[in-house]
């Protein structure tokens, strides 16, 4: 195979130096294609009853695992960059670039599911017996992705056993799992980063106090407007709706209420990190907050795409084996997979819910000159 980027396009150039071991590794050697392309062992073939679609099944899942490896590689580098007291603008730009790369990979993985769906349930049944006790639940790399992202052990849906039990006595796998659980996750590091958002300082701009004041004024104006409603029933409905909104805001302004929601699993961020996320959302048009806002958006994209991938997987499993059969690894199959679509598996849940706490643009506290100067010279 010729590479158009490594030649002038003339494959018969007499002056060209032939590729050899003296020049360096050739394409196949560099990519170790002899190992990669020889790693498809069809069990149906070994049983002398070859099933054509088993090859597709193997290739698709191997492709998933290769992309999982790249996602882990990107996550590890991003975690290293975030694990610092100060993150300058250059690093933030690189983090955004690598998160965007993960987003594009996940889009590719979501689009890969329909290829597997070209196989009919009957085709799958022809070789499904060879898969047991293998199961997608045993994908070590996907578990590492979840842990490095920030899926908490206590948030996981259990099916008859702890999620690590499927790795048995595989010391290498168990060590990798423990290391991913003990190391700071992307969620933890993003939380620390948000807690340092400039403008949260009580002896400085004190965004949180100004935001509370703006919310109080906004709700007071809403009450005043509702009181002018001529129809009593409509007025009472509007006042009731305003009180509900007041309770929603109370859940972020009262630290005790927020901490209770975190303990219950309904929120992920610390109280101060949530403040930072809200501030970045409000002032995303400010140059200093532009990249941080992109970063938060990409984290939501990653969560969304993983959920989409899970959903596509659930639908495919239901099409292939129905909703009553057990999975090949002994899990509850469709029922278990469907349970992973809940918010408990959404790592950056708080970012999705930020829109709940928005106020009209004109009510957002204006930045004063002091904080503007600070944002010019301070990295987030």
Swiss-Prot record:
Which pathway is this protein assigned to?
Answer: Amino-acid degradation; L-tryptophan degradation via kynurenine pathway; L-kynurenine from L-tryptophan: step 1/2; Pigment biosynthesis; ommochrome biosynthesis
The protein's required cofactors: heme
Q: Which domain of life is it from?
A: Eukaryota
**Cofactor annotation comment:** Binds 1 heme group per subunit.
Give the GO biological process terms. L-tryptophan catabolic process to acetyl-CoA; L-tryptophan catabolic process to kynurenine; ommochrome biosynthetic process
For this chain, one GO molecular function annotation is: heme binding
Where heme is bound, by residue?
A: 313
Question: Which InterPro entries does the record match to this protein?
Answer: Trp/Indoleamine_2_3_dOase-like, Trp_2_3_dOase
Q: Which residues bind substrate?
A: 57-61, 128, 328
Query: What catalytic activity does the UniProt entry give for this protein?
Result: L-tryptophan + O2 = N-formyl-L-kynurenine
The alphabetized UniProt keywords are:
Dioxygenase, Heme, Iron, Metal-binding, Oxidoreductase, Tryptophan catabolism
Look up the EC number in the record and give it.
1.13.11.11
What is stated as this protein's family in its record?
Belongs to the tryptophan 2,3-dioxygenase family.
> What's the stated role of this polypeptide?
Heme-dependent dioxygenase that catalyzes the oxidative cleavage of the L-tryptophan (L-Trp) pyrrole ring and converts L-tryptophan to N-formyl-L-kynurenine. Catalyzes the oxidative cleavage of the indole moiety.
Q: How does it assemble?
A: Homotetramer. Dimer of dimers.
Q: What is this protein called?
A: Tryptophan 2,3-dioxygenase
* Organism from which the protein derives: Drosophila mojavensis (Fruit fly)
């Amino acid at each position: 195979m010729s590479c158009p980027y490594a030649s002038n396009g003339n494959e018969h150039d007499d002056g060209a130096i032939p590729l050899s071991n003296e020049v360096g590794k050739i394409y196949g050697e560099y990519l170790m294609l002899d190992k990669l392309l020889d790693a498809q062992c069809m069990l149906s073939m070994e049983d002398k009853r070859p099933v054509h679609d088993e090859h597709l099944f193997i290739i698709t899942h191997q492709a998933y695992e290769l992309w999982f490896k790249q996602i882990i590689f990107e996550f590890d580098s991003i975690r290293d960059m975030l694990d610092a007291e100060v993150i300058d603008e250059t690093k933030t730009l690189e983090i955004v670039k690598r998160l965007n790369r993960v987003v594009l990979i996940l889009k590719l993985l979501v689009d890969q599911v329909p290829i597997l769906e070209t196989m009919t349930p009957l085709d799958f049944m022809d070789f499904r017996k060879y898969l047991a006790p293998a199961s997608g639940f045993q994908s070590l790399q996907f578990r590492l992705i979840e842990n490095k992202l920030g899926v908490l052990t206590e948030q996981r849906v259990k099916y008859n056993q702890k999620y690590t039990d499927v790795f048995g006595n595989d010391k290498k796998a168990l060590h990798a799992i423990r290391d991913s659980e003990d190391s700071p996750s992307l969620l933890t590091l993003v939380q620390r980063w948000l807690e340092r958002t400039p403008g949260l300082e009580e002896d400085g701009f004190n965004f949180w106090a100004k935001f509370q004041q703006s919310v109080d004024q906004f709700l007071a104006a809403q009450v005043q407007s509702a009181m002018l409603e001529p129809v009593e029933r409509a007025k009472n409905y509007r006042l009731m709706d305003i009180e509900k909104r007041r309770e929603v805001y109370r859940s972020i302004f009262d630290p005790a209420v927020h901490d209770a929601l975190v303990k219950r699993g309904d929120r992920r961020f610390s109280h101060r990190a949530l403040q930072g996320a809200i501030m970045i959302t409000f002032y995303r048009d400010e140059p200093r907050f532009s990249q941080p806002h992109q970063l938060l958006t990409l984290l939501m994209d990653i969560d969304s795409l993983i959920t989409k991938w899970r959903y596509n997987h659930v639908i495919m499993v239901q099409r292939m084996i129905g909703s009553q059969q057990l999975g090949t690894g002994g899990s509850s199959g469709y029922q278990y997979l469907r349970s992973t679509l809940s918010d408990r598996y959404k790592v950056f849940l708080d970012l999705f819910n930020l829109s709940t706490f928005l106020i009209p643009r004109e009510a957002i506290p204006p930045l004063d000159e002091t904080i503007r100067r600070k944002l010019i010279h301070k990295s987030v």
